[in-house]
Amino acid sequence: MSKRAMKKIIPLITLFVVTLVG
């Protein structure tokens, strides 16, 4: 996976985790 894609995916994962935990 390219670093450019990672930069887009990481915030989405973070948001998903925050939604689950919160």
Curated annotation (Swiss-Prot):
Superkingdom of origin: Bacteria
Keywords in alphabetical order: Plasmid, Secreted
Keyword check for Secreted: yes
Cell location: Secreted
Annotated GO CC locations: extracellular region
Coiled coil: none
Prosequence residues removed at maturation: 1-14
Biological role stated in the UniProt entry: Acts as a competitive inhibitor of the CAD1 pheromone.
Note: IAD1 appears to be a component of its own signal sequence.
Record-given protein name: Sex pheromone inhibitor determinant
